[in-house]
A protein has these predicted regions:
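Bulky hydrophobic segments
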Residues: 1-94, 100, 104-204, 209-215, ...
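Asparagine-centered strand-capping/turn motif at beta-strand->loop junctions
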Residues: 216-220
């Protein structure tokens, strides 16, 4: 076995370990973004490894080498996602696309620097354009994530105020439609069982504050049974391990809810809430009847 082929096999083994062995990645926006972004450099290296391993093979000169490496790189990415599906792993078409971007980037970078194949200047310019496009695709979600964190941290102790669409990066829907209209988040409850919107991953340390202030309105002609729940990173996903409270809103009523943080701290039954690591705030409809609309103006700490 040639040394190049051995290196390629080791690279495939390493790629398999990175894809299928659970990694200690935090369940945060940053963690998810960086985990997804990692597919592109991984399959860039896999495809580049195929190119360097097979470049001296007489059956794959010129364009054939690029076709082989591209098919192996992109195909390996697709197969890796197919394999993850029955293993209850987080397989997605987004990951397949990221794998393909890595493979195409490897082909473009290789074309820029290899001199065995006779290429015209415009071929190399095309390869440069493709490489830059792939790098832009790779960097876009990372830049978007960075902007979201800078915005979130700069607004604190305001947790959400909906003056910018960046706020939507920190909201999750559970059986609702949501959209920013003016300076408020308009929420339409669609599902019947506890639909709501979560404000995920706020600035976590609330220890220097006394009150959670939520400015909301019920714009509908029916009353709304509004539920508020808050939990920390230790939350075990049970009702008794978080703060829960209901607030009835009359038809057309706008109200500022003021929740003492001491109440939130004492929310879990068997322990105290970790006020240095708050993870999630959720506003939801408590019952199946009543208003199907909620307007959220802001959430802040005082």
């Amino acid at each position: 076995m040639s040394r190049r082929l051995l290196y390629l096999l080791l690279l495939f083994v390493l790629a398999g370990l990175l894809l299928f062995v659970p990694m200690p990645i935090a369940p945060t926006y940053a963690g998810r973004t960086l985990e997804n972004a990692g597919h592109t450099p991984l399959f860039f290296l896999v495809t580049l490894g195929v190119l360097f391993t097979m470049r001296d093979h007489p059956r794959f000169p010129g364009v054939r080498l690029y076709a082989l490496a591209g098919m192996i790189g992109a195909g390996a990415g697709f197969i890796s996602e197919v394999i993850q599906k029955p293993l209850a792993r987080d397989a997605s078409w987004e990951d397949v696309a990221a794998d393909a971007v890595g493979a195409v980037l490897a082909l473009a970078v290789y074309a820029l620097f290899e001199r065995r194949t006779k290429m015209r200047a415009w071929h190399r310019l095309g390869a440069l354009a493709v490489a830059l496009s792939c790098i832009a695709i790779f960097l876009t979600p990372i830049v978007r994530m960075t902007r979201a964190y800078v915005h979130r941290n700069g607004e604190f102790p305001v947790l959400a105020d909906f003056h910018s669409r960046i706020e939507l990066y920190w909201t999750l829907s559970f059986g609702v439609n949501r959209e920013i209209v003016g300076d408020a988040l308009e929420v339409e409850f669609v599902a019947d069982e506890f639909p709501g919107v979560a404000f995920h991953e706020p600035v976590a340390d609330w220890r220097n504050f006394k009150t959670l202030v939520i400015d909301v309105a019920n714009p509908a002609a029916e009353p709304l049974d509004l539920g508020v729940r808050v939990h920390d990173r230790q939350h075990n996903h049970t009702f008794n391990d978080r703060f829960n409270r209901r607030y009835p809103l009359a038809a057309g009523e706008r109200r500022t809810l003021r929740i003492p943080l001491e109440d939130i701290r004492n929310g879990p039954r068997q322990r105290l809430m970790d006020m240095a690591h708050i993870s999630d705030i959720k506003l939801f409809r408590g019952g199946q009847a009543g208003s199907r609309r909620l307007r959220v103006y802001s959430l802040r700490l005082e």
